[in-house]
Regions:
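Extended terminal and domain-junction accessory segments
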Residues: 1-191, 196-203, 213, 223-229, ...
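Short strand-edge motifs at loop-to-beta-strand transitions and within beta-strands
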Residues: 206-210, 216-220
Length: 245
């Protein structure tokens, strides 16, 4: 990477394979020159054109938060930890979808960085992304915190209307906000800016990880059912897996 000549004893070597034996049968692997589809059965699509599924069981709005440290002496403050919905991993379980359900999750990235988000035990599809007014939303978000507790940085109680790291969401998780979303956060709708941004070609289809960019809402369609079932064919409460999740 620094432009130095490759060492011929290590990375400067190339391995070459020469296949000279004739085939024992018909080659059934894909031939790109023929232009045929690699997947004979089209992939199930929960979303097309940046539009959420025609029907879904629940919407959630969850935040990505960076907890910052205070400057001490000559050392500048910086990120101490990254939290999902302002909650530590040892916090109580908050996302409890029903098996078979289809949900729309809107991930609100309040940090300065892109974060790859991975969901366990299920795949999902990226719907779209959209920018929002970060400064105005942060003010509304901070204003929703009740105060109390103890700020470990200052040793004093948090005043009301100030962001409380690792407190969890500022509002009741299971009470829908003005956007009709669970998660315990102020609705992001009034702060959205500009048009939606469609997924890149490589982001289409089923994914287990997608990048969530700063200052944007990333919307994903999550279905808690096998990926080969047709869109709209699953029902919340019905287990279509071959095991008990």
């Amino acid at each position: 990477s620094n432009g130095a000549k490759a060492d011929p004893k290590t990375v400067g070597q190339i391995m070459q394979f020469r296949v000279v034996l004739p085939l024992n049968g018909t080659d059934t692997t894909a031939n790109p020159a023929l232009g045929a589809a690699l997947r004979p059965t089209p992939m199930v699509k929960l979303t097309t054109g940046g539009v959420p599924p025609a029907s879904f069981d629940q919407k959630r709005q969850l935040t990505l938060n960076e907890v910052m440290g205070m400057p001490q002496g000559i050392y500048p403050g910086g990120p101490l930890e990254i939290l999902v919905n302002n909650s530590k991993w040892m916090a109580a379980v908050s996302e409890t979808p029903r098996v078979g359900a289809t949900e729309v999750w809107e991930i609100i990235n309040l940090t300065a960085d892109a974060h790859p988000i991975h969901l366990h035990l299920t795949q999902f599809q990226l719907i779209n992304r959209q920018s929002f007014n970060l400064n105005k939303y942060l003010k509304a978000y901070a204003a929703a915190f009740p105060g109390g507790g103890l700020d470990p940085m200052t040793g004093l109680p948090y005043p009301a209307g100030v962001y409380m790291p690792a407190y969890g969401p500022p509002l009741a998780y299971n009470t829908a906000n003005a956007d009709g979303a669970l998660g315990g956060n102020p609705a992001i709708g009034p702060f959205l800016q500009g048009p939606i941004r469609l997924p890149e070609p490589n982001e289409n289809g089923w994914k287990d990880t997608v990048n969530m960019y700063p200052g944007q809402v990333s919307r994903i369609a999550v279905r808690f059912a096998p990926t080969d079932l047709a869109a709209g064919s699953t029902t919340a409460g019905t287990n279509n897996y071959s095991f008990d999740p």
